[in-house]
Amino acid sequence: MAAGSASSLGGGSWPGSEAGDFLARYRQVSNKLKKRFLRKPNVAEAGEQFAQLARELRAQECLPYAAWCQLAVARCQQALFHGPGEALALTEAARLFLRQECDARQRLGCPAAYGEPLQAAASALGAAVRLHLELGQPAAAAALCLELAAALRAVGQPAAAAGHFQRAAQLHLPLMPLAALQALGDAASCQLLARDYTGALAVFTRMQRLAREHGGHPVQQPELPQQLPSVPQPSLPGPQPRPVLGSTLPLPLPPDHAPGSVAQSPGTLGAFADVLVRCEVSRVLLLLLLQPPPAKLLPEHAQTLEKYSWEAFDGHGQDSSGQLPEELFLLLQSLVMAAHEKDTEGIKKLQVEMWPLLTAEQNHLLHLVLQETISPSGQGV
């Protein structure tokens, strides 16, 4: 069955004599795995021969055949109860299927074999992810999820890629929150490419909450060593050196650097602050684009829009809890008011001023907000 499937996936990329030679060798190795009376099959030897055949086929650019041989290697490793070997073989098979799909799209401009290699790659990588999780390797599982998501995004399937990015973020979150936030950002970008603006808004909201939780922890100051009591030294005959004044006095510490004190963080630390800025701007633009009715406006979204109303303006050009630069905050505040008043000309002028301050993704959202203001659709663009 596997040989027949491999023949169907080959698509005539192999001359007839060489294809027959491959099938003969594949069947010859497969026959060694059949159970016989009073004879135990040598699974390890068969796995090595399948791996050797896969290397030869890969060198000859026969990618689907090599991938099916790697799947046979994975079955042999499973029979030997060798989880790492099985996961490695499944990963190699998936990469070969993905390479076949990319080559077909580059050469022919269409999916290979009606998208079957892409489905086979997703299935193999999914099995490898489950194995890594069973082995207690969430980082390796997350890396495979990111690899599959990037491949799906590259072949023009951003909606499917977003789910794998979110799964990678879930696996990264306990140990590497910054990597999890980056994966969530990629998921939100994929949802924007797929025009799932409601889903992107939910992801940005979650990103902002996680960035505040993991990026605003105070830093514990190290304990200073306590001074030991001075022991009187026996006096020696002869002149003694004069002690230096102040050499034994402890240096005064600032109030916020006392031993064992907790330094209060002025805000979100490091790269988490950049994540907060991106999420805040993107959420405001998405809310202006979607324009949800008050009955369907979630409390966290209502609080976001309230921060940019004139009533919430504190006179310093920034809200008390925000991380935005003052200029960007004032421009966003003006944009919210202009969108509320349906001021098309005002939005156009603000677009010119905000263009250098936003990313390409955010500038596209701002353009959609302008188009929605000019031609309202009732459900966003």
UniProtKB/Swiss-Prot annotation:
Residues 213-260 are annotated as: Disordered. InterPro entries: F8A, TPR-like_helical_dom_sf. One of its GO terms (biological process) is vesicle cytoskeletal trafficking. A motif (Nuclear localization signal) lies at residues 34-36. It is found in: Cytoplasm; Nucleus; Early endosome; Nucleus, Nuclear body. It comes from the Eukaryota. Keywords: Acetylation, Cytoplasm, Endosome, Nucleus. Residues 231-242 have a biased composition (Pro residues). The modification N-acetylalanine is found at residue 2. Residues 218-230 have a biased composition (Low complexity). One of its GO terms (cellular component) is early endosome. RAB5A effector molecule that is involved in vesicular trafficking of early endosomes. Mediates the recruitment of HTT by RAB5A onto early endosomes. The HTT-F8A1/F8A2/F8A3-RAB5A complex stimulates early endosomal interaction with actin filaments and inhibits interaction with microtubules, leading to the reduction of endosome motility. Interacts with HTT (via C-terminus). Interacts with RAB5A. Found in a complex with F8A1/F8A2/F8A3, HTT and RAB5A; mediates the recruitment of HTT by RAB5A onto early endosomes. This is 40-kDa huntingtin-associated protein.
